[in-house]
Amino acid sequence: MQSPRALLPKASMSDSHSNNGFSVLRHRNFALYLSARTLATLAVQMQNVAIGWQVYSMTHNLFDLGLIGLAQFLPFLALILIAGHAADRYDRRNLVALALFAQMLCGLMLLLFAYTGLSAVWPIFAVLVLYGSARAFMGPATQAILVNLVPQQDFSKAVALSSSSFHVAVIVGPSLGGLFYLAGPKTVYMISSVLLVLAVIMMCLVKSVKQASASGPASWHTVLEGLRFVWNKKIVLGAISLDLFAVLFGGATALLPALAHDVLHIGPNGLGALRTMPGAGAALCSIALAFFPITRRVGAWMLGGVALFGLGTIVLGSTTSFVVALVVLFLMGAGDMISVYVRHLLVQYETPDEIRGRVSAVNSVFIGASNELGEFESGITAGWLGLTRAILFGGAATLGVVGAWTVLFPALSRMDRFPHDDKK
C-alpha cells in the first residue's frame, strides 16, 4: 500500500516555501479546480436562499423547510459509498465535471419551473432529489482530488484557500440570492444556471492528474473499505463524528427563513444577510489559517471551535435583534471553520490515496447527515417545541456532544500536532 503522501505532485526546485497563502494558485490545475468549485458553490448558495424562501412562502410550514434537506440527503445516502468507490476507480476530474453538469441541469429545471409557475412544491423537491444524487458523486471526488493537485508543502495552504474560496461564495451567494429574489425566483435561477455552466467549463480545463486507482471489480467489500478504515482509525472517527452530531443538533440554517419572517421580521434580503454571516466568519477564519496554520494543540482547537458553534446557537435562539443574530452567525461560522480545517487535514493526512475516495465518501456521509438530515431534524424539532426552543435545544445538545467526545475520544482532545508533523 502506497504512502498517503506518495501521490502528491512533486515540488520543483523553483517552488519556494512561501508564507504567502495565495502562492498555491501558481498550480494551474488547482486554480481551475478552485474556480469551478467557487462558481458552483456561489450558484448553489443563491439557489438555497431562493428555494427556502419560495417553499416557505408557498406553504408557511416549518416541516417543509426540513423536507428540503431530507429530499437531498436520502439519495445522497443511497449513492455515496458507491460514489466513493467510483472516485478511487475512475478519473476524479471527470467525476467532478459530470456532477457539476448534473447540478447545472437541476438549476435549469428550477428556472423552467419559475417561468411556468408553480402551484405545488413537489416539483422543487423532485429536483432536490436529483441534486442530492449529483452531490453524492461530487463530494468524494472533490475531496479526494485536492491532494493530487498540489505538492506536499502546499497542501495545507490549498486546504485553507479552498475553504476560504468556498466560504467567500457562501458569503456572497446568499446575499445575491436574497437581492435577486426581489426580482423573482426566475432571476436567481437564471444567474445561478449561468454560473454552473462556467463551473463545468472550468473543470473540463483541468488536466489529468496522477492518482492511485482501486484494483479489482466493485463489490460490497471494496465499497465498504472506507467505512472499515474510518472505524479502525479512532481519531479519524472521533473527528468526523464530532462534526456529524454537533451540526446535526446545532444547525439552525434550515430555520433561518422562519426566524427571519416570524422573529426578526425581515424580508428575503435580510434572510440573505443572515445566510451570509456564517460564511463571512468562516472565510475570514480560513484566510487567517492560510497564513497562520494551526500546528499545536490541534485537538483542543477543534473541540473549542465546535463549542463556540454551540454557544452561538444558544444566543441565536435567545435574541430578537437582527444585529445580534448577524454577529452570532459570524462567530458560529468562524468556530465551524476551525473544526472543518482540523478535520479535513487529519483525514487527508491519515488516508492512503488508493482508498481516499471511499474514505472521503464516508466523510461526506457524515457531513451530509449533519447538514441535510440536520435540516430535517430542525424542522421536526421546531414543529414539536416551537422555533426558538428548537434552536436553544440544538445549541445545548452541541455543547453536550463536545463534552461527551472529550471523554469518548481522549486521543482527539489530547492531539497536539497533525500526524505528518509528529513523524518529522
Describe the residue ranges of each PLM region.
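Alpha-helical transmembrane-bundle signature of multi-pass membrane transport and export proteins
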Residues: 2-424
